[in-house]
Amino acid sequence: MKLTCVLIISVLFLTASQLITAVYSRDKQQYRAARLRDEMRNLKGARDCGEQGQGCYTRPCCPGLECLGGGTGGGVCQP
């Protein structure tokens, strides 16, 4: 009986804290989609061109680099 009461009270407490947190953070994440989009653009794997030492099988090398060693597995961007 005591354990059941403790569980019920803890669930109510956690639910109340979640609701309070949701109310206070409702307007804090404006433009979240735009921020995530900008973060995705800055990821190393999301660049439009391959940097030095990266593979150039599926995307072209960055300016100033060329694709060398283009065998069956693709080449590597080198200056």
Swiss-Prot record:
Q: Which residues carry this modification: 4-hydroxyproline?
A: P60, P63
MF term (GO), any: toxin activity
Give tissue specificity per the record. Answer: Expressed by the venom duct.
| The keyword Signal appears for this protein | yes
Q: Which residues are processed away as propeptide to yield the mature protein?
A: 23-47
UniProt entry keywords in alphabetical sequence: Disulfide bond, Hydroxylation, Ion channel impairing toxin, Knottin, Secreted, Signal, Toxin
Endpoints of the signal sequence: 1-22
- Where found? Secreted
Among the Pfam families in the record, one is: Conotoxin
What does the entry list under GO cellular component?
A: extracellular region
Q: What job does this protein perform? A: Ion channel inhibitor that inhibits the increase in intracellular calcium upon depolarization in DRG neurons. In vivo, both intraperitoneal and intracranial injections into mice induce hyperactivity.
Q: What is known of its domains?
A: The presence of a 'disulfide through disulfide knot' structurally defines this protein as a knottin. The cysteine framework is VI/VII (C-C-CC-C-C).
Q: Which family does it belong to?
A: Belongs to the conotoxin O1 superfamily.
Q: What name does this protein carry?
A: Conotoxin Kt6.1
Q: What is the lineage of its organism?
A: Eukaryota, Metazoa, Spiralia, Lophotrochozoa, Mollusca
